[in-house]
Amino acid sequence: MTKSELIERIVTHQGLLSSKDVELAIKTMLEQMSQCLATGDRIEIRGFGSFSLHYRAPRVGRNPKTGQSVSLEGKFVPHFKPGKELRDRVNEDEHEEAHT
């Protein structure tokens, strides 16, 4: 699902909200989450999951075209850990689809 598809679904299910309002709300939420992670903070949405940063240590990689060794710097990458309710729902829905 893309961001525009998400906006469309929310507008369809919430008839009182305009497309512009939903788009602004989603853009604002994503911007706030990005800023939070950029400053090293953790985000927890109960029942859904948590977002945090994981550190990838410096390492030696390979250029796939030449096979030459390349030194890669350490970096932080965003990580999502689904909450129990989300995991249960995904497995429940997957289980139902497998039997239909």
Curated annotation (Swiss-Prot):
Top-level lineage group: Bacteria
One GO MF term: DNA binding
Single GO biological process annotation from the record: regulation of translation
Keywords: DNA recombination, DNA-binding, Transcription, Transcription regulation, Translation regulation
SUPFAM superfamilies named among the record's database cross-references: IHF-like DNA-binding proteins
Basic and acidic residues composition bias: residue spans: 82-100
Stretch list, region Disordered: 81-100
The keyword Repeat is annotated on this UniProt entry: no
GO cellular component: chromosome; cytosol
Function, in words: This protein is one of the two subunits of integration host factor, a specific DNA-binding protein that functions in genetic recombination as well as in transcriptional and translational control.
NCBIfam families according to UniProt: hip, PRK00199.1
Subunit record text: Heterodimer of an alpha and a beta chain.
Protein name: Integration host factor subunit beta
Organism of origin: Pseudomonas putida (strain ATCC 47054 / DSM 6125 / CFBP 8728 / NCIMB 11950 / KT2440)
